[in-house]
């Protein structure tokens, strides 16, 4: 019932968001409609931002904080129209829309690995299994000059979007409706993956069968047995009601959920320099905010899951997991070994 209601609300939101489509809208009578120089006075701009998760997740809270700061630092001249809970589609759906001419979506919070399918070679390194050993390790990267280079990659390679800032949503873990105790129990399972070569390789390395399912269809896929398991960070697992259909989560922490907020070049170039600076500053603040809340939010949600009767399986030794996916790492760092080692050695 909860999912049906969410689907109905999503449809309504989609209709509303599509009224008057056309991406970044500038409320500046008589102004031109192309290029930064056409908005020299910094007229009010509304930017549509997509988020696949609900607002009570770590990333949803970060998005909301970012939107509030953009409005504050731009003195109200830039407004973020935040469309959460996947009403604008999956991350791949959103990226496809953003990269199309005349996009109706201007910004999005995406997983780092989402850009892999769009030529993101550097961002791919962030999603390799067991790259980051801790949150502190990730933040040493995210606050480094190297991270700034990574954020520039999509705009430098002509993708059509640019990275604004990094954040994280916690380590990702497998969850299932089956009773599992360790890595060996995943063998033969049908595990949901996105259309991502890294995750496909990871699941195969564990002896399971990767099955591509859209995020919006994952709940029903678990409910009907189309897939046996999936993986998400702890907060996202709870907020998307997955415990209702898959009550066991094993804390393998195979990947740290590195995320970034991106904006289309088209939307960026319609902003005045002052508005661009306001968004950049808001991004810096949102990144710090994300770091300040992520661990506490995750600890709180984990306690709630245990209290609700979820079967939470601890993993004391991750060595077997790391060994099982070692070939995935070796295969995907070819040509970028030095860059990858720089990240690994930041721990």
Regions found by a protein language model. Name each.
Residues 1-5:
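Positively charged n-region of N-terminal signal peptides that target proteins for export
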Residues 8-9, 297:
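Generic detector of short alpha-helix boundary/capping microenvironments
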Residues 150-152:
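Glycine-centered hinge/linker elements that transmit conformational signals in sensory
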Residues 10-15:
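Hydrophobic helical h-region of N-terminal Sec-dependent signal peptides
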Residues 139:
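N-terminal glycine-rich phosphate/adenylate-binding segment common to multiple enzyme folds
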Residues 22-136, 146, 156-347:
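N-terminal secretory/targeting leader peptides
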Residues 16-20:
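C-terminal motif of bacterial Sec signal peptides marking the signal peptidase cleavage site
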């Amino acid at each position: 019932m909860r999912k049906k209601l969410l689907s109905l609300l999503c449809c309504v939101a989609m209709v509303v968001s599509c009224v008057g489509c056309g991406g970044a809208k500038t409320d500046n009578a008589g102004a031109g409609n192309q290029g930064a120089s056409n908005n020299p006075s910094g007229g009010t701009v509304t930017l549509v931002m997509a988020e696949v998760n609900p607002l009570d997740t770590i990333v949803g809270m970060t998005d909301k904080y970012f939107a509030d700061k953009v409005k504050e630092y731009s003195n109200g001249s830039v407004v973020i129209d935040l469309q959460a809970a996947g009403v604008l589609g999956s991350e791949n759906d959103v990226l496809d829309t953003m990269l199309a001419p005349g996009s109706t979506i201007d910004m999005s919070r995406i997983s780092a690995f989402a850009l892999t399918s769009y030529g993101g070679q550097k961002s791919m390194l962030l999603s390799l299994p067991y790259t980051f050993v801790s949150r502190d390790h990730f933040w040493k990267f995210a606050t480094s000059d190297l991270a700034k280079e990574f954020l520039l990659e999509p705009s430098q390679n002509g993708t059509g979007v640019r990275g604004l800032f990094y954040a994280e949503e916690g380590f990702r873990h497998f969850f299932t409706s089956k009773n599992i105790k360790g890595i060996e129990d995943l063998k033969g399972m049908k595990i949901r993956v996105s259309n991502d070569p890294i995750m496909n390789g990871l699941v195969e390395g564990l002896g399971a069968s990767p099955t591509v399912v859209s995020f919006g269809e994952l709940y029903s896929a678990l409910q009907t047995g189309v897939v046996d398991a999936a993986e998400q960070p702890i907060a996202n697992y709870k907020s998307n009601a997955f415990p209702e259909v898959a009550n066991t989560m094993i804390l393998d922490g195979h990947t740290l959920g590195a995320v970034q907020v991106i904006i289309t070049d088209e939307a960026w170039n319609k902003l005045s320099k002052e508005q661009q600076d306001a968004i950049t500053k808001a991004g810096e603040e949102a990144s710090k905010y994300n770091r300040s809340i992520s661990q506490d939010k995750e600890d709180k949600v984990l306690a709630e899951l245990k209290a609700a009767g979820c079967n939470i399986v601890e993993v004391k030794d991750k060595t077997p997991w790391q060994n099982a996916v070692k070939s995935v790492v070796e295969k995907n760092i070819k040509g970028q070994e030095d860059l990858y080692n720089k990240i690994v050695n930041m721990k």
